[in-house]
Amino acid sequence: MKKLLLIATASATILSSSVSFAECIDNEWYLRADAGVAMFNKEQDKATGVKLKSNKAIPIDLGIGYYISENVRADLTLGTTIGGKLKKYGAATNTHFTGTNVSVSHKPTVTRLLINGYVDLTSFDMFDVFVGGGVGPALVKEKISGVSGLASNTKNKTNVSYKLIFGTSAQIADGVKVELAYSWINDGKTKTHNVMYKGASVQTGGMRYQSHNLTVGVRFGI
């Protein structure tokens, strides 16, 4: 948690520096909120070898930002992903499970704090097209279930999360813009730990969480 607070302070300092650099320009702050649908990349369960697939998850972000120039902006966002799982019922391939069918589920809890930057590539009469990226700390843990004797919860791990984004935005009222965006986010791996299963030590956890996100957002000038 201390790492998260330290990196958050650094992120806020960077954002503040960007604002100071642009004070001579007539810009404004904005608040933002985003939500949508996400799917995690396929991953393999370490204990059983079963390749897991994602169900749909809901990414949510809240943040505050600043228009540095007409085509450049930066913001600080606090986000999470709700309801997603990596799961599957299939044939195990690892030792201790070979030849058996098992059900495996990994449910993550992710909290990320990102400092993001965006550049408008083109500006049309009705909408803008932009690209951007973000980086910051993420707290990642997971609940593992399915195989009797292997169910467990991993503790929070602090990772460096990064994000790539491409989208379009349009102004719908004075100081209000909406956007539709695709983003790819890498939140890193969870902690690994060993559990005893039928007299043997079996490694679980260590799942990497990368997601493809389609979101709708709104920015309010303040």
From Swiss-Prot:
This is Putative adhesin RP828. The keyword Signal applies. Gene3D superfamilies: 2.40.160.20. GO terms for cellular component: cell outer membrane. Adheres to biotinylated epithelial (Vero cell) proteins. Keywords: Signal. InterPro entries: OMP/PagP_b-brl, OmpA-like_TM_dom. Residues 1-22 form the signal peptide. The keyword Nucleus does not apply.
